[in-house]
Amino acid sequence: MMSNGGDSSEIVRELEELKLKKAEIEHRISTLEAKLQDTAAVELYDAVSNGDSYLTAPELEHGLSPDQIYRYSRQLLLPSFAVEGQSNLLKSSVLVIGAGGLGSPALLYLAACGVGQLGIIDHDVVELNNMHRQIIHTEAFIGHPKVKSAAAACRSINSTIKVDEYVEALRTSNALEILSQYDIIVDATDNPPSRYMISDCCVLLGKPLVSGAALGMEGQLTVYNHNGGPCYRCLFPTPPPTSACQRCSDSGVLGVVPGVIGCLQALETIKLASLVGEPLSERMLLFDALSARMRIVKIRGRSSQCTVCGDNSSFNKQTFKDFDYEDFTQFPLFAGPLNLLPAESRISSKEFKEILQKKEQHVLLDVRPSHHYKIVSLPDSLNIPLANLETRLNELTSALKEKGNGHANTESCTNPSVFVVCRRGNDSQRAVQYLRESGFDSAKDIIGGLEAWAANVNPNFPTY
């Protein structure tokens, strides 16, 4: 035992001596490397002082630095792009409106390829359900402004470009001032009022607009207001019906679809900025993810009768500032709760919880689409999608009769009650309006829908 102890002590002592020698050797290596660098610097200085200019960085007519030549070398090697394209790109400025599914890939590629000045505007914060498609963000930025997250990502890719941050919503009150600072505008938003507003502003400022859209399994892309081409209003003088306008958060999107369109938005922007290639003006690219098919269609040219860019248009900057785009499109700029019903036609999620606890007779009608209902639902609920409610009222009547032991009356349906739920409390209000008009006087909306249930009653209830 003693000899083993002695052996251990000897090993420890020898190990410490070796560690000390290692530290001394590493210190000596660092010292010699520093001296070598100093010697090389002195030799270079002496050579330059003696007129040996071949050792200095050459003065290049195109103005690109050695670092820029190396960073962008793979682009410089392209005959169709070359030095001229890169120089134009470095002098350009681009504003990307929206740092979401479309803006994420567009921003990353624009930063990487060397756009000189890159602006990012978005009022929203990063959420977990952004991760599958908004690839510029990471989980570390959840709860933080998207602009801050996107700007950090762009700077981490290319620290040599200027990145401007606008943590605010784009409105008529600030759009002219912000957009006027950039050469090219990229619309990466997802709602009609923003599209009209951005296009109108670009017309007033004479800016080309790279516009993309992605929803579900489809996407599209075009360039407006370029070389005499049309603006958004030329194609859509009248807003589409609100039933045809949906956001990704409502209808869903496969993450890679906005990724494809966002990359193509970056490409069109690079073509505009570098003066290389043929931008998608007066043409529209359509992408179908399910068939992996892309096609380009001809779209109508600029309309001389357009109320904004037409020959006799009286639309000006003051008109723009005073214009109500939400009223024009009948669509909100930002997704939020509707308020369609009087207070007596609504109950809170906590009040509905009390009804369940008291075991009061009722029918819980879930008016979400059936594929939403399959994701998650409250127990003992009846699923009739809002779009089918009119043709399937008999199912609700049957459910009421069953709950009321055959005493429910289809004329009044006062007992038991009908409580209507949806995802966020908007479609349920529309359903209650229709039900009350149809004689179901006891119908009430559950305020805030399933999201409110998860927030106020059951934190373990999944949201999506």
Swiss-Prot record:
Zn(2+) binds at residues 231, 234, 306, 309. Coiled coil: none annotated. It is an enzyme of class 2 (transferase). GO terms for molecular function: ATP binding; metal ion binding; molybdenum cofactor sulfurtransferase activity; molybdopterin-synthase adenylyltransferase activity; molybdopterin-synthase sulfurtransferase activity; ubiquitin-like modifier activating enzyme activity. Pathway: tRNA modification; 5-methoxycarbonylmethyl-2-thiouridine-tRNA biosynthesis; Cofactor biosynthesis; molybdopterin biosynthesis. The active site is at 248 (glycyl thioester intermediate), 422 (cysteine persulfide intermediate). One of its GO terms (cellular component) is cytosol. It catalyses: [molybdopterin-synthase sulfur-carrier protein]-C-terminal Gly-Gly + ATP + H(+) = [molybdopterin-synthase sulfur-carrier protein]-C-terminal Gly-Gly-AMP + diphosphate; [molybdopterin-synthase sulfur-carrier protein]-C-terminal Gly-Gly-AMP + S-sulfanyl-L-cysteinyl-[cysteine desulfurase] + AH2 = [molybdopterin-synthase sulfur-carrier protein]-C-terminal-Gly-aminoethanethioate + L-cysteinyl-[cysteine desulfurase] + A + AMP + 2 H(+). One of its GO terms (biological process) is Mo-molybdopterin cofactor biosynthetic process. The keyword ATP-binding applies. Its EC number is 2.7.7.80, 2.8.1.11. It holds the Pfam family Rhodanese. It comes from the Eukaryota. It is found in: Cytoplasm. Its cofactor is Zn(2+). CDD domains: RHOD_ThiF (cd01526), ThiF_MoeB_HesA_family (cd00757). Binds 1 zinc ion per subunit. Keywords: ATP-binding, Cytoplasm, Metal-binding, Molybdenum cofactor biosynthesis, Multifunctional enzyme, Nucleotide-binding, Transferase, tRNA processing, Zinc. Residues 358-462 form the Rhodanese domain. ATP binds at residues 101, 122, 129-133, 146, 190-191. In the N-terminal section; belongs to the HesA/MoeB/ThiF family. UBA4 subfamily. This is Adenylyltransferase and sulfurtransferase MOCS3.
